[in-house]
Amino acid sequence: MAMISARRYFLLGLLVLTTSAYVTVGDEGDPCQVRSDIPGICLSSSACENIRGYLKSGTLSTSQVPSCGFGAREEIICCPTVACCATDRGREVQFHATSSERSSLPEPKREPTPEPEPLPPTTTEGKRERESRLDENQNFFDFNKLLSTTVKPQKTHESLKLPTQESMKTPTHESMKMPTHESMKLPTHEPMKLPIQSVGAWGIAPSKTQPIASTQRSFMEPEWGREPRIVNRPLTTPRSRPQRPNNSNFNTNPSPNNNNLIHLVNDRLREQGMQIEPAREVPMVLQTTPTPTPAPTPTQLIDPFEPYRFRGQDRDKDTQPQEPWNDVSNNLDADPAPSIFNPAETRPTTPNPNPSRVNLPEKERPSVAACEKIRSGGKPLTVHILDGERVDRGVYPHMAAIAYNSFGSAAFRCGGSLIASRFVLTAAHCVNSDDSTPSFVRLGALNIENPEPGYQDINVIDVQIHPDYSGSSKYYDIAILQLAEDAKESDVIRPACLYTDRSDPPANYKYFVAGWGVMNVTNRAVSKILLRAALDLVPADECNASFAEQPSANRTLRRGVIASQLCAADKNQRKDACQGDSGGPLILEIDDVDGTYSIVGVISSGFGCATKTPGLYTRVSSFLDYIEGIVWPSNRF
C-alpha cells in the first residue's frame, strides 16, 4: 500500500513539470530536445525515470522541461535519454576526497623522517617496554588476586560536592521558593481551586486584588502572564485574549492584522498566477412589489403528452432552420487529403442505408424535438456571472463530472454533458482504455469534492464509443455513456440542447468552455469549482495552418482538420480548455439573459493549454445520426 501511495504522489508530482514555458509537440516515442546539450524522447510523465536525477541535481528545473502534449490520463513530457547523476556523484567524490585529505594531514609530516624499525610489532613492543610506568605487582594487574583479596579499597579522592546557595553566596529571591498551602492561604481540601499556571519560570503569579467566582474560570485572566504563543496554526489571524463580556467596551471594528494577512495571502496567490479581484459589495435589492408568478407556464406542463407531439403542423416554424439534413451516414470526409471546409459550404448528399430517415427535415429530428421539450418548461435558467470565471449554481445544469475508480477512491478526470435523462455525451479518448472505465457520473454539483445539496451520483452501465474512433488519431472523438437510472430533473440538473446546424453560427454569438480541469498553467492547480472561459472560433484554414506546424499532427491529423471538427482559442492566449476538461462541452450561448444555449462541440484535444495552437473540438452536428440512434432510437425520446 505504501508503494501504491508513493507512486500516486510521484505521478501527481510529475504533473507539475507541465509548467514549462517550452512546449514541444509530440506523442510517445517521438524524439525531442530537452536542451541544446540534452537529447530526449517523448514519454508519459510516469514512465520518465531519468528526469528525477536532473531535478535533484539542479541541472534542470520544472519550468525547463518541455511538454509534448497530453495523453489519455497524464501529460507527455520530453524525457532525457541520458541518465543524470554525474553532478551529484561528482559532488560526493569531491566531498569524500576533501575529508580523506584532512584525515591524512599528519601523514606527510612523518614521511620525511623514516624510522629505522619498519616492523610494527617490534616497534609497539619496544614502546611498551620503555613507556611502562606501572607496577605489575599491584593487585589490579592480577585478576585472580583482585577477586580473592579482602582488603577494602582505600579512598584516594574526595567526592564532588554540588554547590549550594550558601556556598555560592548568592541572594535568594522569594519568588524562587516553592509555594505552600500556608503561603498561598488556600484550604488543603479544595485543590481544584488552584489558579491556572500559578507557578512558572518567573515565579509565583501576582496575587489578585479581587477573587474570581468559580463559574468564570473557563478562561484565563489577562494579568496571569504573557500572551500565549501560537505555533503552527495555518491561515489564522492574531487574536486577542478572551475577556469578560462587557457591553460598554464591546468593539465591532475588525483588527487591522486581519486585513494585512488577507493582503499577504492575495499577494502570494497572485505570484502563483491566480487572478485575485478586490471584493465588491453588491447591494441586495429587495423586491417589494410582488413579481408576476409564472401562472400560465405551469399549465403547459399539465399535459404529459405535449412534449411528444413533435410531428404536428401547429409547431413554430422558426425555432430551427428549415434546411434538410443531407448527410445522415456520418461518412465524414473519406478523402485522405486535408480538408479546409468553408462554413457556408454543405457536403454532398450520400445514400442513406436507413430508408426511414432519408432527408429528414431539421424540425422532425429527435434531437430538435428533445430540445423543444427542454425549452418548453418556460423556466429561465440562472443568469451568469458575466465578468467572472466561476459559474453560478444552475447556469449549466447539464454539466457532468465523470468519476473513475482510482485505488479505491473516486477521481474526476473528464467532463460530459447530460443530453437526455439517461445519457451523457463525452469524448471517446476519456473512456477508450481499460484503466479509463467510468464508474459513475456526478450531476448538479459545482464543487465536485464537496457538492451542494441536490446533486446526484448515478452509475454508468454502458459506454458507446464511435465505431470509427482510433486512439492514434483525433477523428471521431465522441462517446455516449448510459446511466443506470434516469436523472431527476431539477433547477440544477437538466439536459442540454444540441446544435443541429452544420454551418458555423454567426460571429456575434458567444462560445464558452466549462469544466473542472487545470485552471493555472503555472502551478497546475486543478479547480474543484466549475469554471468557464470565453473563446472565439478559429477559421478552418487558420486552424489547419497552426496544426501543420506541429510534427505529431502528421500522424494524429493526417487529413487535417475536417468538417466534423471545430477549432476555438483565446486571442490573448490566457484562457483555454486544459487537462481535466476533456469531454466537456463547447457551449454556444444564444441569449445570456434567459440562459438559452446549445452544445456545439465536445472538448477533444490540443497542444498544451492556452498556446498559439487552437484547441480541437468534435462538431456535434456532424454526429446527430450516431447520437440519435443511441439516445432516441426509432424517434423515441
Curated annotation (Swiss-Prot):
Residues 385-632 form the Peptidase S1 domain. Coiled coil: none annotated. Gene3D superfamilies: Trypsin-like serine proteases. GO terms for molecular function: serine-type endopeptidase activity. The active site is at H429 (charge relay system), D477 (charge relay system), S582 (charge relay system). Residues 234-244, 321-332 have a biased composition (Polar residues). Induction: Up-regulated after wounding to the integument. Levels are higher with septic wounding, using either Gram-negative or Gram-positive bacteria. Residues 95-137, 152-178, 216-260, 286-365 are annotated as: Disordered. Residues 245-260 have a biased composition (Low complexity). The keyword Protease applies. GO terms for cellular component: extracellular space. It is found in: Secreted. PROSITE patterns: CLIP (PS51888), TRYPSIN_DOM (PS50240), TRYPSIN_HIS (PS00134), TRYPSIN_SER (PS00135). Disruption phenotype: Viable and fertile with no obvious phenotype. Reduced adult survival after wounding of the thorax, especially when the injury completely penetrates the thorax (strong wound). Wounding coupled with septic infection (septic injury) does not further reduce survival. Survival after wounding is increased when flies ingest the oxidant paraquat. Impaired melanization at the wound site. In pupae, aseptic and septic-injury does not induce the cleavage of PPO1, and in adults and larvae PPO1 activity is abolished. InterPro entries: CLIP, Peptidase_S1_PA, Peptidase_S1_PA_chymotrypsin, Peptidase_S1A, Trypsin_dom, TRYPSIN_HIS, TRYPSIN_SER. Residues 125-136, 306-320 have a biased composition (Basic and acidic residues). SMART domains: CLIP, Tryp_SPc. Residues 31-79 form the Clip domain. Residues 1-26 form the signal peptide. Belongs to the peptidase S1 family. CLIP subfamily. PANTHER family: ACROSIN-RELATED, HYALIN. Serine protease which, by converting prophenoloxidase 1 (PPO1) into its active form, plays an essential role in the melanization immune response to physical or septic wounding. May function in diverse PPO1-activating cascades that are negatively controlled by different serpin proteins; Spn27A and Spn28D in the hemolymph, and Spn28D and Spn77BA in the trachea. Also required in the systematic wound response by mediating the redox-dependent activation of the JNK cytoprotective cascade in neuronal tissues after integument wounding. This is Serine protease Hayan. It comes from Drosophila melanogaster (Fruit fly). The gene is Hayan.
